[in-house]
Curated annotation (Swiss-Prot):
This is 3-isopropylmalate dehydratase large subunit. The gene is leuC. It comes from the Bacteria. It comes from Mycolicibacterium smegmatis (strain ATCC 700084 / mc(2)155) (Mycobacterium smegmatis). Pathway: Amino-acid biosynthesis; L-leucine biosynthesis; L-leucine from 3-methyl-2-oxobutanoate: step 2/4. Its cofactor is [4Fe-4S] cluster. Binds 1 [4Fe-4S] cluster per subunit. It catalyses: (2R,3S)-3-isopropylmalate = (2S)-2-isopropylmalate. GO terms for biological process: L-leucine biosynthetic process.
């Protein structure tokens, strides 16, 4: 019996011929990523680490530190990096949301295993990587031993056909999947098929990242020319992609016709079986619009927002907050003029941080407020008050809605303006 992508990676890293659903294996971990929150809460420096070249540290969730407790974590992180000679240390100023930093620096590579304490680590699956969020205790163990264990879960295959229409993004693809099929608890997600070639890497990253919202174990994409070009651009050639066997056993194979999709919105509470076409929630008034996070704070997301906002103004009574996914994205967007267009429209642009996404700082919503976000989660209380409502949509939908003052279809709004390449 053949193997899926994840089964292939687990087998290779366990040093065995085959792995199939239900089996437990101990595997070598290629990269372990630590984030700032670990160093601010109950940090105890290990007495040894297995391999400093396989460790990275990223300051991301609480940057700049909004509390004394968070500020105290910084010295812990710097001491740890210095004591063990960890060169991949992305301190404040070089930082970004860890999954963006992982992408920019090629830390998630085809056919490899990456672990991190952040729940959205499945974002690395866009690179044909077995990327998984784990608890702090397990990550400590990996630091010391270089290994961890996994039980291989059944895999759901999404066979993509067609191509996304104008105005439809990876966010819409995910929201459709989450609504149509619901949770994927104790399952892996695998994306492939002829339609994959039409999905840009930034949209693949959005889809992979959001796998956490439907409780997937791994959320992994097939290796193709898009990934080959990406790693060539980074100057990285040392990797071995994993390809699913033709006779791989899947729990389900679901065909998604990308050309049939439209902009989607997840209603407050959850993304699972809770999405609708944007027309069904228009014209819900909003108080805050947010563009950012590891899922949708990438350079292309800011380009789309800038093109929609250029020459226009955010509606009275609406605050638009934009958070680039990394300081590198921030600098690139500044050089390209995107941030100028966004700021001129009346938006607030923050430094790179996870702050607003998890309701910590730089965009917390209050009681009775309605927020439309392109971030990762919309459960009650996620971005602040438990009495707030959080709708989730693509950056295009968020930007257009910020101008309209209510949730709206960006395609309709843009059609009334000059042409914008969504």
């Amino acid at each position: 019996m053949g193997m899926t992508i994840i089964e292939k990676i687990l087998a290779r890293k366990a040093g065995v011929a085959e792995v199939h659903a239900g089996e437990i294996v101990t595997v070598e971990v290629d990269m372990t990523v630590l984030i700032d929150l670990q160093f601010a809460t109950m940090w105890m420096q290990p007495l040894m680490i297995n391999d400093a070249s396989k460790v990275a540290i990223v300051m991301d969730h609480a940057v700049p530190a909004p509390t004394i407790k968070d500020a105290a974590g910084g010295p812990n992180a710097r001491k740890f990096a210095n004591d063990y000679g960890i060169e991949r240390f992305y301190d404040v100023g070089r930082h970004g949301i860890c999954h963006q930093v992982i992408a920019e620096n090629g830390l998630a590579r085809p056919g490899e295993i990456l672990a991190c304490t952040d729940s959205h680590t499945c974002a690395g699956g866009a690179f044909n990587t077995a990327a998984r969020g784990l608890g702090p205790a397990e990550v400590y163990s990996i630091l010391c031993t270089g290994q961890t264990w996994f039980q291989a879960s059944p895999t759901i295959r999404y066979e993509l056909i067609g191509s996304m229409p104008a105005g439809v993004s990876g966010k819409d693809v995910f929201l459709y999947i989450a609504d149509a099929f619901g949770d994927a608890t104790n399952s892996n997600l695998e994306y492939g098929g002829p339609g994959l070639a039409s999905i840009p890497l930034n949209d693949r990253r959005t889809i992979a990242t959001q796998g956490a919202e439907i409780s997937a174990d791994f959320s992994t994409f097939a290796y193709d020319d898009v990934l080959a070009e990406h790693f060539d651009d980074l100057g990285i050639t040392s990797y071995e992609p994993a390809h699913a066997d033709p006779d791989a056993a899947y729990a389900a194979v679901r065909e998604i016709d990308l050309s049939a999709l439209a902009p989607y919105v997840a209603r407050p509470g959850t993304v699972s079986r809770n999405g609708v076409s944007v027309d069904e929630v228009e014209p819900r008034k909003i108080d805050q619009a947010f563009i950012g996070s590891c899922a949708n704070g990438q350079l292309d997301d800011l380009r789309i927002a800038a093109e929609i906002l250029r020459g226009r103004r955010v509606a009275p009574g609406v605050r638009l907050i934009v958070t680039p996914a990394s300081q590198q994205v921030y600098r690139d967007a500044m050089r390209l003029g995107y941030l100028q267009d966004i700021a001129d429209a009346g938006a607030v642009i923050t430094n790179s941080t996870c702050g607003a996404c998890f309701g910590y700082h730089m965009g917390v919503v209050g009681p009775g407020e309605v927020c439309l976000t392109s971030s990762t989660r919309n459960f009650t209380g996620r971005m602040g008050s438990t009495e707030a409502e959080i709708y989730m949509a693509s950056p295009a939908t968020v930007a257009a809605s910020a101008v309209a003052g209510h949730i709206t279809d960006a395609r309709k709004v843009v059609a009334q303006w000059l042409q914008v390449s969504l």
